[in-house]
């Protein structure tokens, strides 16, 4: 997307490239699922920069890992990484490697190399992502070599795939008509206009090798009010996924895929109903019925 033009409180034109062909849309409603509040930002709306809230990660897979690794213990792998870092055999960043529980029966294992949050919040995000990409991709061969040589379960391992781009956990968010606060999540607060639910812990990936997890009460959940998805500055723009209006801690819970998909469904439903001339209240009622089913 290259342009979003607003006239007063409405976005009237969006310009993008689709397979290198220019595409211009004059929308009645816009649902921004970009993860970066791109439409709102380009249209001049107020946004919040959450790029420094969380560390990014690069996901890759290994093949021919011993399928018994899970029973032998993933903790042993972490201990080996820590010892190698302490002895200077690996860069300190390698201790931030996370293993997704597994491997599968055919020996495929998914790993996440968690990077450090930006040290300079004023650094342009494109420059930061470039630096992260270079750093992470240079470390993967070194990590693989260490695992093959030093951890028995990886003796025959080989690189399977590397994600085409970094996983960015936090980016720009809209300024909404309401804001999901940390206290709303931790207090499992419900809302009469709630359109999505979440129950994942606050999961903060900062400078420590492991995430800081803050859990809700067991079997409880919080609700996200529709106004968190509605731009305060633009009447025909809704945001879903990790770019709706929320505090940093609240978004560290609400950004997970299940909740993100629920906000997308709610935003799309609201947009469709408003195009039909129906009210926001009707959209809330329909979405809440869906949540109860």
List each model region and its residues:
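Flavin (FAD/FMN)-binding glycine-rich loop and adjacent Rossmann-like elements that form
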Residues: 1-4, 18-29, 33-292
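Short, hydrophobic/aromatic-rich segments at coil-to-beta transitions
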Residues: 8-14
């Amino acid at each position: 997307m290259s342009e979003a033009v607003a006239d007063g409180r409405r976005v009237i034109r969006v310009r993008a490239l689709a397979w290198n062909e220019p595409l211009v849309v004059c929308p009645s409603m816009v649902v921004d699922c970009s993860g970066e509040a791109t439409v709102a930002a380009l249209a001049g709306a107020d946004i919040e920069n959450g790029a420094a809230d969380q560390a990014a990660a690069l996901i890759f897979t290994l093949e021919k890992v011993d399928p018994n690794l899970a029973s032998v213990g993933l903790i042993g792998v972490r201990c080996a990484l820590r010892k190698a870092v302490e002895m200077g055999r690996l860069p300190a960043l390698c201790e931030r490697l996370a293993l997704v529980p597994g491997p599968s029966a055919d020996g495929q294992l998914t790993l996440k190399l968690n990077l450090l949050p930006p040290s300079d919040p004023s650094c342009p995000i494109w420059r930061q992502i470039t630096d992260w990409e270079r750093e992470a991709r240079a470390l993967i061969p070194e990590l693989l070599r260490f695992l093959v040589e030093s951890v028995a379960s990886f003796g025959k391992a080989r690189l399977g795939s590397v994600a085409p781009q970094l996983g960015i956990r936090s980016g720009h968010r809209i300024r909404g008509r309401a804001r999901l606060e940390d206290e709303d999540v931790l207090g499992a607060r419900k809302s009469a206009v709630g359109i999505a639910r979440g129950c994942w812990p606050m999961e903060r990936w900062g400078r420590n090798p492991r995430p800081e997890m803050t859990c809700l009460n067991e079997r409880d959940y919080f609700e996200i009010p529709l106004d968190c998805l509605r731009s305060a500055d633009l009447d025909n723009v809704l945001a879903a996924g990790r770019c709706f209006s929320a505090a940093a801690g609240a978004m560290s819970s609400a950004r997970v895929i299940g909740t993100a998909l629920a906000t997308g469904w709610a935003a799309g439903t609201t947009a469709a109903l408003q195009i039909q001339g129906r009210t926001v209240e009707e959209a809330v009622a329909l979405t809440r019925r869906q949540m109860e089913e």
